[in-house]
C-alpha cells in the first residue's frame, strides 16, 4: 500500500511539474468523464484499471470527488511502467 501511495504522489508531482515541452500525454477531460475516470484511462492508455493514475494527476483525493473539465498531464505508458517498476508496484 505504501508503494501505491508513493505512486499517487509521484504522479501528482509529474502532473504539476512537467514542463510544456517535455514528453507527456496532455488530455482535456470531457463532460462524460466527470464521474467515471475509467473512461479517461481507457481512452488514454487502453486500460480502464489505470483510473488511479487519472485520479492522482487530477489531484483528486477520493473516487467520489467529481472531475472538473481540465487539462490533465499524464505520463506516457512507457513512463508509467518505468515509474511503477522503480516503486515496486509491478
Regions found by a protein language model. Give the residues of each.
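Cell-surface/extracellular proteins and modules involved
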Residues: 1-90
Amino acid at each position: 500500500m505504501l508503494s501505491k501511495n508513493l505512486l499517487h504522489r509521484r504522479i501528482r508531482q509529474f502532473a504539476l511539474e512537467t514542463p510544456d515541452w517535455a514528453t507527456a500525454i496532455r488530455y482535456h477531460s470531457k463532460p462524460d468523464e466527470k464521474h467515471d475516470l475509467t473512461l479517461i484511462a481507457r481512452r488514454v492508455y487502453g486500460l480502464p484499471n489505470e483510473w488511479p493514475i487519472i485520479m492522482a494527476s487530477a489531484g483528486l483525493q477520493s473516487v467520489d470527488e467529481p472531475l472538473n473539465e481540465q487539462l490533465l498531464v499524464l505520463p506516457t505508458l512507457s513512463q508509467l511502467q518505468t515509474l511503477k517498476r522503480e516503486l515496486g508496484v509491478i
